[in-house]
Amino acid sequence: IIWIGTDGQGVFAYTKDAYTFCNITLNQLPIKKKRPVRAIQTDKDENLWLGTKDNGVICIKNYRMAKEYSSSNVIQYTMQDGLANNSVFAFSLSRKNILWICSDGPGISYYSYDDQKIHRISDARYVHTIYEASDSVLWVGADKGLLKLSVEWKGNKPIVKDSKAFLSEVRGKRFDIQIYSMYAENDSILWLGTRGSGAFRFNMYTGSYQNIRFNKVGIPPIDDILCILKDSKQRLWFGSSYGLTRLDSYQKDSVSFTSYSENKGLPNNTIHGMKEDSRGNLWLSSNTGIIQFNPDSEVFRQYNYKTGLDVFEFSDNAYYQSPFTGSIFFGGINGVVWLQEDSITENKMVPE
């Protein structure tokens, strides 16, 4: 405990560590193949869903209370169970009673909480990210651009009625845009992160867009956008294969930004995932551990095997923040780690 004295305002006691890290390694699970975790999701039933590269979906029941892992609380789903593909890159909880599952292709499946089975819905290929704008519209990021899927429902069973492609042409030229990340800024603006083509600010109502490039500094990997976040102070952040970028302003013909790389104290340049905690810190997953970044003080701190993490080399797409607990999850080559903010003990004693 750290005791802090004030001038006439009493004494405050704060616990030393504000965060707790939890690990689950693939070696702890009753599965034969050990493949990198590429997607993460939790649900209201305390299930932890892990999408893997080439080993299907792993569901850990009551994950926060589990002490051991066996076939009684770990279920694996593969193509034999209805998955479209065993390489799973994204999850999204639907407004309906299903879980969307996106994979290498042919593309999209869903898990029904009603019948507890996996079903296929679309042949979209190489789907890395998905956003359910409403119960009738899905936006899907794939290797050939952006897809808008129009969905109808029979009860809790979805049916794709129409598919429309966007961003297949940029500046009048045929362009194969590989979309890796999405961030919904509001109900009309969707930010898209691409492999090598920068970021796109896309209007879901009009179909108009602005392509924002950061490689004016002569470093092409900075346009390899792996994750996007708008923080609580309305600052837009982009994680890439060459560090962290803050978008300061953007006009039609001009972009102003601030970049952070290993040259500026960032512990590792590859930023796979990014989330913000309630204190305004950004948490970044990298090739060498988890990085805590204070955007105001511009101070970095790294967590890895030296600080007790069993998972410290992370994967693209594998980042998630639970709306149920606030915990931040990152998936890696040998498992998953999550951090939860501990309640800071405030013991205020005011002298008489």
What are these regions (language model features)?
Residues 1-352:
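Carboxylate-rich, polar loop motifs that coordinate divalent cations or form catalytic acidic clusters
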